[in-house]
Regions:
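Gly-rich Lys/Arg/Thr-decorated short loops/hinges at beta-loop-alpha junctions or inter-strand turns
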Residues: 24-28, 66-75, 146-148
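N-terminal amphipathic, basic-rich helices that act as targeting or association modules
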Residues: 34-41, 49
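Residues forming the flavin
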Residues: 1-15, 56, 79-233
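A short alpha-helix-loop-beta-strand transition element characteristic
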Residues: 27-32, 46-60, 102-104, 176-179
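Charge-dense, low-complexity intrinsically disordered segments
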Residues: 27-30, 34, 77-81, 157
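Terminal amphipathic helices with adjacent charged low-complexity linkers/tails
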Residues: 55-87
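Glycine-rich active-site loop/strand segments that organize a redox cofactor
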Residues: 2-36
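Short alpha-helical functional segments enriched in proximate histidine and acidic residues
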Residues: 43-46, 93
Length: 233
């Protein structure tokens, strides 16, 4: 993010690389992380071009804030709806291609199985959730972008269908399952406030970087936490 380091606090590709490696407990693949750090500016530019309304300072430049234990303020945000606005921007860009006829979209479909031909993925079997019909889709290349499996945990900010079913279908057909510990769940998320909400809400990470801490609502709950911690360790 050094090219967008408007506050001039000596941010660089290497500092972003190091923070990401450290945040991954030094288990991440360094080549991939460094490439991510290199193209991070381009990713922000692409999001802006898609219409993501990132916050700006009074001079009109994109604003930054501290987030996730980083050494410097390098996080671009859109009020308290950053993730949602990123999704809206991505879906809007995709829908423009759908309208042009260059991309076909099949909403309300659930992946049931992966199709292999001579050991290579060549398509999927899916169910139409509206009609219940089983459909098949062939392709020269198959990319599984299922959003992880964070919803196997009781509290998670992942979407409700991020339940591990797609990863399991691929694993059954011989795909390697690497680093299952890399799961982001945010157990301190806020419960849903209505039947129409498909995921929980995160507040803890940004508040922590602003110096806030989580405390029990009742004083006596502190002892319960300490006793539970003592038994755990």
């Amino acid at each position: 993010m050094q090219q967008k380091n408007y506050q001039n606090d000596n941010d660089s590709v290497y500092r972003l690389f190091y923070d990401t490696i450290k945040g991954g407990d030094y288990r991440s693949r360094e080549a991939n992380v460094y490439r991510l750090a290199e193209v991070s500016n381009n990713i922000i530019d692409q999001c802006v071009a898609q219409g993501v309304p990132f916050a700006r300072d009074y001079g009109g430049l994109l604003d930054n804030r501290s987030f996730g234990g980083a050494q410097v303020s390098r996080t671009f945000y859109a009020r308290g709806q950053t993730g949602q606005q990123l999704l809206i921007g991505a879906y809007a860009a995709m829908n423009r291609q759908v309208a042009k006829g260059t991309v076909k979209s099949y909403p309300r479909h659930e992946m049931l199985d992966l199709v292999l031909v001579n050991g290579e993925a060549k398509g999927i079997i899916a169910r139409n959730i509206i009609t219940g019909e089983i459909e098949r889709f062939g392709a020269h290349a198959v990319v599984i972008a299922s959003g992880g499996y964070g919803n196997v945990y009781f509290l998670s900010t992942n979407a409700m269908n991020s339940n591990g079913s797609s990863a399991w279908q691929c694993y059954k057909k011989g795909a390697f399952f690497a680093n299952p510990c890399f799961a982001q769940i945010h157990p301190t998320c806020i419960p849903v406030h209505g039947s129409q909400q498909s995921k929980l809400t995160l507040m803890s990470e940004s508040l922590r970087n602003d110096g806030r801490i989580w405390v029990p609502k009742k004083k006596e709950d502190v002892e319960k936490i300490r006793k539970k911690t003592d038994k755990t360790f």
